[in-house]
Amino acid sequence: MQSYNVAVLAGDGIGPEVMAEAMKVLNKVQEKFGFKLNFNEFFVGGAAIDHCGYPLPAETLKGCDEADAILFGSVGGPKWTNLPPDQQPERGALLPLRKHFKLFCNLRPATLYKGLEKFCPLRADIAAKGFDMVVVRELTGGIYFGQPKGREGEGSQTKAFDTEVYYKYEIERIARAAFEAAMKRNKKVTSVDKANVLQSSILWRETVTEMAKDYPEVTLEHIYIDNATMQLIKAPESFDVLLCSNIFGDIISDEAAMITGSMGMLPSASLNEAGFGLYEPAGGSAPDIAGKGIANPIAQILSAAMMLRYSFNLNEAADAIESAVQKVLASGHRTADLADDSTPVSTAEMGTLITQAI
């Protein structure tokens, strides 16, 4: 029997509540599909600060090093906002984890499920078509990290500058991740650039076009970033995998998230070249609703499904979870963030319904 070690970092706010439901679902699929997940739980974020004084304790990092994947909840909250920036939960835990594991590839799915069209802010006829896409964003290169960057001069002569830098190998590895993702989906990649203006985008387009030769089954399209933001609003159903540089992916992934209508539904993954991943909901720790049993656990559950698919290659089990989510939503069950009536299901009830639908 295949066996995998999972470091479980529930974190703060609604993290522990929604993580409990993801574990419920994972226990069901491992039993049904015949593999073994060994869960090891560790403190992270504010919970770790309260427990031992550090947002990312050595014991937690060691546990992650020994794991095959990290299932992450959420970190942060008003309790810890007065700490020095590098000791706050987000900057002191999540960013060091990304750096330590060299997580260069961010996957952000955005799906509009049947029955949830009215939450989509787009025109009704566009929302009625639905959409199911994933944004593949390069995380470690580009203008956020390029040198030189800085600020100099005085008065009206003050200037500030940033540099967009991409090496070919950085583009090759993120392009490969996008094509591999497309192979597990609808076999279409739309590469986003600004090759009519930027040298970095010209290299991006050339490199992605070369990489496409290794994936003859996948259709490749190129689109300028300005047009991409328009087409996301006009025809989101036309996209499958969107391949983006760091800054373009930052913008596009948030735009795609917003048109789904609920952040509580959106998972994400950050991967390194070995396929090791950190999987987490795209939303935050929502301290205002923590402990009330009303948080939507679907983003955490779908993050667990992504872990099965992208780190463990357990596609059948991942499909089963995603289908169960669709089934439960189609049958009209909603948590408070999506409920039409005065009787929404609780966090635990939603987790149980999805587990039963597998």
Swiss-Prot record:
Signal peptide: none annotated. One of its GO terms (cellular component) is cytosol. Substrate binds at residues 98, 108, 137, 226. Its cofactor is Mg(2+); Mn(2+). It is found in: Cytoplasm. SMART domains: Iso_dh. Binds 1 Mg(2+) or Mn(2+) ion per subunit. It catalyses: (2R,3S)-3-isopropylmalate + NAD(+) = 4-methyl-2-oxopentanoate + CO2 + NADH. It is an enzyme of class 1 (oxidoreductase). NAD(+) binds at residues 77-90, 284-296. Pathway: Amino-acid biosynthesis; L-leucine biosynthesis; L-leucine from 3-methyl-2-oxobutanoate: step 3/4. Mg(2+) binds at residues 226, 250, 254. Keywords: Amino-acid biosynthesis, Branched-chain amino acid biosynthesis, Cytoplasm, Leucine biosynthesis, Magnesium, Manganese, Metal-binding, NAD, Oxidoreductase. Its EC number is 1.1.1.85. Coiled coil: none annotated. Catalyzes the oxidation of 3-carboxy-2-hydroxy-4-methylpentanoate (3-isopropylmalate) to 3-carboxy-4-methyl-2-oxopentanoate. The product decarboxylates to 4-methyl-2 oxopentanoate. NCBIfam families: leuB. This is 3-isopropylmalate dehydrogenase. It comes from Haemophilus influenzae (strain 86-028NP).
